[in-house]
């Protein structure tokens, strides 16, 4: 089947998705860069012309009303994800929703239940979940090359306090939902067991959102993950998985570039490149295409239950830090 993709929103992340969809079409995949919707028609038209999309709409309602749209990618700030994803679902559209999936777990539960009721595909666009590097890392853990795995660490930080969505509580700002979600997902992909204990700390920005945070997860099997995210500094973005015979380094947990294996003497014994990609977003699109072709209502790479589990964890972290968004009061 040809899958006609529509993008709801015309910001930077929408451009990244547009490039991926266009790249898929150029390499012969049955995917069409079909339509874009923005709050202003002129902006949508400029985006469509620049990115090679066939149609432009000056409202989100018009976009989701187009009967030829097969998949809507929600690319607005995460404070608006619930509203915009639900709008698309109400109009019978399958949805790929950018992370963080929603503002909180309550919204996530409502949205996934609504999609299931409507019989539509809904999945969270947390891109490392869909990348081939995910299975490569899991296969290495299972192979025993680093022995018995006991712990991991992961971090992600960028100096982006100048970006309004990061510091504005009305936009669900803070490092956790925008950046911290990646180390958390890295840990939960590597260690799928139930989390037994959580400890954490955060430093707040002047607007009372979290500027940087440190999270330690202890899993029921005794493994541990130590995680850090920040919107104040550039970090090395490194993921390290530790075993009793060595360790695995993942260069850039946000978009893995290379995987290295080290022995107990800290000597690199193997370097594994990740497959070439358009920009990494294409794997989400292909997963949605496969799901639609097979009649699935969620993607196995990020099932609804896992999205809700991550949102519940982030809710509990914010609660422990005393961070409540204005819309939640």
Question: What is the meaning of each model-derived region?
Answer:
Residues 39-40, 274-286, 302:
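Active-site loop of classical SDR/Rossmann-like NAD(P)-dependent oxidoreductases
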Residues 71-73, 220, 287-329:
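C-terminal helix-rich "cap/oligomerization" subdomain common to oxidoreductases
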Residues 71-78, 82-126:
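Beta-strand-loop-alpha-helix segment that lines the small-molecule cofactor/substrate pocket
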Residues 128-199, 206:
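Predominantly a Rossmann-like dinucleotide-binding segment in NAD(P)-dependent oxidoreductases
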Residues 53-60:
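Conserved SAM-binding strand-loop segment of SAM-dependent methyltransferases
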Residues 185-258, 275, 287-294, 328:
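Contiguous beta-strand/loop segments that form the cofactor/metal-binding neighborhood of enzyme cores
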Residues 31-35, 70-72, 174, 247:
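Short active-site oxyanion
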């Amino acid at each position: 089947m040809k899958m006609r993709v529509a993008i709801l929103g015309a910001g930077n992340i929408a451009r990244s998705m547009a490039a991926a969809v266009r790249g898929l079409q150029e390499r012969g995949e049955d995917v069409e860069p079909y339509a874009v919707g923005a709050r202003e028609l002129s902006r949508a038209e400029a985006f469509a012309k620049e990115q090679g999309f066939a149609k432009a709409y000056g409202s989100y309602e018009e976009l989701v009303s187009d009967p030829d749209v097969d998949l809507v990618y929600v690319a607005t700030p995460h404070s608006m994800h619930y509203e915009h994803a639900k709008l698309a679902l109400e109009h019978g559209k399958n949805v790929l929703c950018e992370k963080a999936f929603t503002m909180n777990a309550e919204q996530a539960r409502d949205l996934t239940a609504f999609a299931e009721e409507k019989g539509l595909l809904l999945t969270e666009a947390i891109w490392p979940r869909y990348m081939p590097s995910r299975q490569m890392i899991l296969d290495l853990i299972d192979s025993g090359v680093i022995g018995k795995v006991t712990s991991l660490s992961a971090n992600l930080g960028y100096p982006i306090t100048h970006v309004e969505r990061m510091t504005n509580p009305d936009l669900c700002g803070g490092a956790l939902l925008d950046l911290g979600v990646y180390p958390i997902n890295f840990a939960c992909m590597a260690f799928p067991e139930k989390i037994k204990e959580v400890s954490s700390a955060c430093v707040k920005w002047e607007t009372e959102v979290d500027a940087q945070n440190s999270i330690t997860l202890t899993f029921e099997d005794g493994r541990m993950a130590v995680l850090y995210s920040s919107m104040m500094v550039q970090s090395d973005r490194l993921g390290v998985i530790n075993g009793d015979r060595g360790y695995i380094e993942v260069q850039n947990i946000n978009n893995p570039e290379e995987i290295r294996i080290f022995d107990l003497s800290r000597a690199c014994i193997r370097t594994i490149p990740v497959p070439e990609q358009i920009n990494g977003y294409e794997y989400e699109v292909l997963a949605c295409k496969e799901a639609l072709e097979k009649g699935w209502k969620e993607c196995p790479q990020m099932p609804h239950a896992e999205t809700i589990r991550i949102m519940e964890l982030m809710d509990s972290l914010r609660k422990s830090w005393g961070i409540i968004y204005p819309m939640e009061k």
